[in-house]
Amino acid sequence: MTQPNPNKQSVEPNRTSLYWGLLLIFVLAVLFSNYFFN
């Protein structure tokens, strides 16, 4: 009963970090596309 609790707590920050990573990749892709097209 004690093991699932820390696992759930560790999953939440991993999801947030994953979303931040995707956001950074999206922003970098937009910046590079603007740089190359301009």
From Swiss-Prot:
InterPro entries: PSII_PsbL, PSII_PsbL_sf. Keywords: Chloroplast, Membrane, Photosynthesis, Photosystem II, Plastid, Reaction center, Thylakoid, Transmembrane, Transmembrane helix. GO terms for biological process: photosynthesis. It is found in: Plastid, Chloroplast thylakoid membrane. It holds the Pfam family PsbL. Belongs to the PsbL family. One of the components of the core complex of photosystem II (PSII). PSII is a light-driven water:plastoquinone oxidoreductase that uses light energy to abstract electrons from H(2)O, generating O(2) and a proton gradient subsequently used for ATP formation. It consists of a core antenna complex that captures photons, and an electron transfer chain that converts photonic excitation into a charge separation. This subunit is found at the monomer-monomer interface and is required for correct PSII assembly and/or dimerization. PSII is composed of 1 copy each of membrane proteins PsbA, PsbB, PsbC, PsbD, PsbE, PsbF, PsbH, PsbI, PsbJ, PsbK, PsbL, PsbM, PsbT, PsbX, PsbY, PsbZ, Psb30/Ycf12, at least 3 peripheral proteins of the oxygen-evolving complex and a large number of cofactors. It forms dimeric complexes. This is Photosystem II reaction center protein L. The lineage of its organism: Eukaryota, Viridiplantae, Streptophyta, Embryophyta, Tracheophyta.
